[in-house]
């Protein structure tokens, strides 16, 4: 399992499903990390930082960290979901749901006019995880 911590030292952590083998995997250049989502096909972990207005990605151990998009793109992401080659997020600037094509790099607003969209989930029975 993976989680974020907005505490005095913001971080992303992971552990086994019984809480053992706890590890801090991402630190530094984080303030309000949230919206974790895993791209199962590529074993990559995506997250948003609601304070720094950016979306980042790393491998499942926090290595190979890369910036996907930042406030330069006029985003304020909160919740994230990934499905095939599309990254979806709730956006407080547009008050809607946007997406980003991970292959082409194109960005779109899909839904607008929401009040304060917090989270987003994709449902596809093929994406059900199994684990220990």
Question: What are the language-model segments listed below?
Answer:
Residues 8-10, 52-53, 94-95:
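Short coil/turn segments within WD40 beta-propeller repeats
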Residues 16-20, 59-63, 101-105:
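Short loop/turn segments that connect beta-strands within beta-propeller blades
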Residues 23-27, 66-70, 108-113:
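Beta-propeller fold detector
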Residues 28-44, 72-86, 92, 114-131:
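Beta-rich, blade/repeat-based domains predominating
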Residues 91, 98-120:
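C-terminal interaction modules of eukaryotic adaptor/scaffold proteins
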């Amino acid at each position: 399992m993976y989680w974020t911590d907005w505490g005095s030292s913001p971080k992303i952590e992971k552990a086994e499903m019984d809480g053992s083998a706890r590890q801090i995997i991402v630190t530094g250049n984080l303030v309000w990390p949230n919206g974790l989502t895993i791209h199962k096909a590529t074993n990559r972990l995506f997250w948003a930082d609601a304070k720094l207005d950016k979306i980042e990605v790393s491998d499942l151990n926090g290595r190979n960290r890369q910036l996907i998009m930042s406030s330069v793109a006029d985003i304020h992401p909160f919740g994230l979901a990934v499905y095939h080659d599309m990254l979806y997020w709730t956006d407080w600037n547009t008050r809607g749901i946007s997406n980003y094509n991970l292959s082409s790099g194109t960005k779109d607003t899909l839904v607008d006019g929401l009040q304060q969209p917090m989270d987003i989930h994709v449902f596809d029975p093929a994406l059900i995880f199994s684990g220990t």
